Amino acid sequence: MKLMVIGGGGREHAIIKKLKENPAVEKIYCLPGNGGIAADAVCVSEIGAKDIPAQVEFAKAHGIDYAVVAPDDPLALGAVDALSEAGIPCFGPDKKAAVIEASKAFAKDLMQKYNIPTAKYRVFTDAPSACAYIDAEGAPIVVKADGLALGKGVVVAQTVEEAKAAVRAMIEDKTFGQSGARVVIEEYMEGPEVSVLSFTDGETLVPMVSSMDHKRALDGDKGPNTGGMGAVAPNPYYTKEIAAECMENIFLPTIRAMRAEGRPFRGCLYFGLMLTKSGPKVVEYNCRFGDPETQAVLPLLKSDLLTVMQATTNGTLADASVEFSTDSACCVVLASEGYPQKYESGFPITMSEEAAAHCYVAGAKKDSDTLLTAGGRVLGVTAVAPTLRAAVEDAYHLAEGVDFANKYCRGDIGRAALAAREERG
């Protein structure tokens, strides 16, 4: 089988490494890929993740049997629709279903209509009305750009002034372009956060092992928000009881709601949850695998990924075997110092054989035989072990085996999870 994966980050590298485990897979193309993914797939760097017509032409010309569309942008732009129309079976939601991530206002309205627990909210298109609402509600309060903003369109404002400044930046200064033309303002929720990725064919939903993301740039959850500095799986806060509650009150109601709206969701539906004192609530939906959660979750998948993906496409997920290991995983992201703000790149990357076997490359390019840094998040290393403590220790050992000039990583990935595990005995 010939496969095509759209995207070029650490998440795509993790997906490709897992797909390669199937002996029927003879070739994987990655569009555009990156210098590190090139070790595991044929990278077609001249075709970007959003260049849908070129992707379709490439798939037809190269006899692609199955495609995986991983990032949010091409999904929102209708990559799955275009490939499916060209006769290429695909993993991922169509454009109508991808709106669950592409518009936060749509997602919030859906939850309100179908009684899916989430934070109280209002949607605004003009700054004065939004600012008046903030004055009335007070702080802390959350301001979100309605559209896609690379995971950076959310401001958790501690003061009224900070919230109003965020609104003005989004609506008036167009910090996120059209994505911030509408803003969602919602109540601040407190509690542990949990990420749950799931496979769904629109009827059946199978949750993957839970995970904990680390979004802030600095230790102790300080500093600006990033795309994610590391992840552990499973999440110790996510007990069997909470999982059952989420399945009944959030997961199944969501896919039923999407069906009822004429937008059946097939692919990976990501639930960003907060475990509040009044129960689990939805923080956000993503219409695809999370990054770096995927790099912690997929190494724990015991079943064949390609078979499970095809079952979501074919509507046969109810008959598929989806099994996860009871081990723990920890992914530590190595970034360029200064990320997510200003950073330098173009530095040579060296890594031990052991680290190379467990790494997922995100921001790197090849210059002849040398791998060079080419992004904020450069790569992630993942360790799997029988205990979370061992997985965390092993992941940091792997991180020591990678070197580049301005290497930076958080030193506390998994610390909160370990504390929670000890607290719960």
List PLM regions with ranges.
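ATP-binding N-terminal substructure of ATP-dependent carboxylate-amine bond-forming enzymes
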Residues: M1-K95
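Active-site nucleotide/adenylate-binding loops and adjacent lid/helix of ATP-dependent enzymes
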Residues: M4-V5, E101-R182, M212, P236-L252
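Solvent-exposed alpha-helices and their adjacent loops that cap or buttress functional pockets
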Residues: E21, G36-A38, F91, K113-N115, ...
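Glycine/small-residue-rich loop that forms an oxyanion/phosphate-binding "nest" at active or ligand-binding sites
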Residues: V68, A79-T118, R122
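Internal nucleotide-binding/catalytic subdomain
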Residues: A157-T294
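Active-site "cap" helix and flanking loop/linker of ATP-utilizing ligase/carboxylase catalytic domains
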Residues: M247-L269, N286-A356
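Peripheral (often C-terminal) accessory segments that flank ATP-dependent C-N-forming ligase machineries
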Residues: A311-G425
